[in-house]
């Protein structure tokens, strides 16, 4: 059986719980910015934050069959969406851009969105660190890593090549 996923404090991740996803290497959070030819008023790219931003996310099982699982397990098919404003409710998606490859964007804005689900696996030998993966329908899962664009934005991308982004989950404490 797959192991439960734990937050940084050692508690099991709860299905539909709210968590801040933080880079293990430098403590950076996840941000949404405009990249490339996106309208700066409508940022769509999911990136590793270069500013002090910590948006909370909601992580939920894609399995709609009752009873719903109580906890998030490794290798479970997951949906991730932002849980705090200004992007509350916006779902993470993967969009195929040639020749740049697959990038994480807010869902529903692109015709070339890749069907699939996210999943979580152990990220390193350090306890309670994980990597995020994207599993396209009918294909093996690939790591989510970082690709720094010419503007210095650290885009989240789906790749066999890039090192995985290793993260910890912190339970979101509303202010």
Curated annotation (Swiss-Prot):
Swiss-Prot/TrEMBL keywords: Disulfide bond, Seed storage protein, Storage protein
Domain of life: Eukaryota
Disulphide bond pairs: 135-141
Signal peptide limits: none
Entry's Gene Ontology molecular function annotations: endopeptidase inhibitor activity; nutrient reservoir activity
Disulfide bond keyword on record: yes
Pfam families xref list: Kunitz_legume
Record-stated family: Belongs to the protease inhibitor I3 (leguminous Kunitz-type inhibitor) family.
Annotated protein name in UniProt: Albumin-1
Gene source species: Psophocarpus tetragonolobus
């Amino acid at each position: 059986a797959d192991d439960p996923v734990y937050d940084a404090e050692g508690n099991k991740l709860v299905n539909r719980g709210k968590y801040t996803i933080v880079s293990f290497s430098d403590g950076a959070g996840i941000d949404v910015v405009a990249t490339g030819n996106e309208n700066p008023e409508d940022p769509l790219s999911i990136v590793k934050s270069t500013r002090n931003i910590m948006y909370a996310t909601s992580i939920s099982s894609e399995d709609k069959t009752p009873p719903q699982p109580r906890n998030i397990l490794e290798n479970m098919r997951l949906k991730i969406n932002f849980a705090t404003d200004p992007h509350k409710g916006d779902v993470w998606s993967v969009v195929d851009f040639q020749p740049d490859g697959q990038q994480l964007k807010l869902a529903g804005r692109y015709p070339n969105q890749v069907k699939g689900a996210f999943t979580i696996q152990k990220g390193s030998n350090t306890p309670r660190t994980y990597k995020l993966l994207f599993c396209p329908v009918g294909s093996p899962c690939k790591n989510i890593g970082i690709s720094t664009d010419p503007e210095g934005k650290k885009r989240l991308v789906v790749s066999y090549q890039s090192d995985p982004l290793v993260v910890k989950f912190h339970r979101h404490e509303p202010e």
